[in-house]
């Protein structure tokens, strides 16, 4: 299947091992278009200290009025079965957050593995395709590939007014989605399969495509 035909669920979480997930955001994309999105804050597992409030840009008192992330079980189980792949920027972090709450999804498609994968990883893809960049942070990639204006446009449409900046869950998920969608305009990648993109997301020589085939920059 061509990757553009796949339904991709782009996810971002804000939180830590200590606090648990304090905010989630996801964007479902298909044929380079956003088909749905959702975001919400979550009641943390532990009281946020001032440093964490500053880091997340969230107030503990306000967060305490929200449901815990564990109450979102059905949402994420259903999301997993509704998409062909999950996607995140540094997907191991998002996968570990999910596993903190639910080690594996209890709902699966026929022949789907008992895991939260497969994952596209925008950080790994860009490391493999553009190895000379050096900085693969989400904000740097958005700036490097002139996605700032489109990100602001999408954020104004989908994000709450107070959560339209980096390190806000839906904002970052939208940024990752743009990094995937821009490949539709690159002929060498636009025609590739979903399996190719999954291999480009992998780390390690045995799992990765030949870098000579991948490197574009």
Label for each model-derived stretch:
Residues 53-80:
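Metal-dependent phosphoesterase signature
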